[in-house]
Structures are given as structure tokens and as C-alpha cells.
Amino acid sequence: MKLVCIGDSITFGYGVFKKDCWVSILSNKLQMEIVNKGVNGDTTAGMLSRSYADVISLNPSHVIIMGGCNDFMCGRKLNMVKDNLEELLKEALNYNIVPIVGIEPPIDAVLAEKKWSGDVNYDLVNSIEEDYRHWIMDFCNKSKINYIDFHKCFKEALKNKNPRELYVDGLHPTALGHKLMYQCVIDVFQAMKLPLE
């Protein structure tokens, strides 16, 4: 099994040491080749433009595709992001690569306003991301595509953790947040019966 992870800063591991990024933890714990193709600030359109070079040409067996937050923070429409994700999935399937969709963690608006930028309506972004999440789950269920609901993992963890424990700045996960993401991936991989040893 060979896995490529394509995404934005949450896949890249912005704000933490490389070894603490969920993709690196996955790579260190599992006996498989894993390539991190996360790019800080990337949008789904950006991912689509580099999909052939960063995913297809590497000939992986599986790909985790995760993005959307940067699109919504830039004011891009939900339908455009859906279209981009559908194209990314179609391209993977055309090359016999098994796609898995990552649903990004929610934004902590209070922390993001203090530590990231005060110029973004984070509540609106979260609301659009919630619609996007439901669409992803519905689309994946109908298409028999697996997804990893990092949003749900974080919501559950935040019931008994302070947001500062899980977020560097309200947007990007801390080392603990990345550990949580790793565990979410493992849970889905186990449900898919992928070889983890």
C-alpha cells in the first residue's frame, strides 16, 4: 500500500514540528510508503491543478484528499468547492487510486480572531463548512467512498478539552490535535480493513 495525502496547511502540518504532523505520525507508525503533499494556503482549485503531478504520477494505491477551508475563507462558493472535490475524486478513480476524503476540523472562532486574523467571519466559514461536511458524507455514502470526519473527532474532543490544547491559533491543530487526527485516520483504516502492520 502506498498513500499520498493531498491538502492544505492542516495536511502540511503548519504550526508544529514535522514529526508531530498527523501524516508523519502515520508514516512512522505504519509499514507503508506515505507522501505528504500538503501545501500551506492551498485551495481545492490549487489541489486540482497539481493533482496529476502530486498524486497520479506517484502511482499510489490510496489518496487522502482534504481541503475547502481556504476556499471558504477567500469567499469562494460552496458549489465550486464541491465541483473541485468531485473532479479530484474522479481523477483518482480513473487511475484506479482509492480515494478517501478528509473532512477538516472546525475553526475555533474566538481563538482564530485573536491569533490568526480579525478580518474573517469565522462563524460564517464554519456554517459553510458544516454544509460542506454534510454534502461530503452524503456524496461519499452514495458513491461508496470512505471519509475521515476530523470535524466530528474535534467536536467530541472539545467536550472535555480546552480549544488551546487542540489549536495553535483556532485554525491549525497543535501536536495533540495532530495525534487526535492520526487516531481518526487509524479508526477509518481499521474499518476499511487496510493492512496496518
State each model region's role.
Residues 29, 49-197:
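Alpha-helical cap/lid subdomain in secreted, periplasmic
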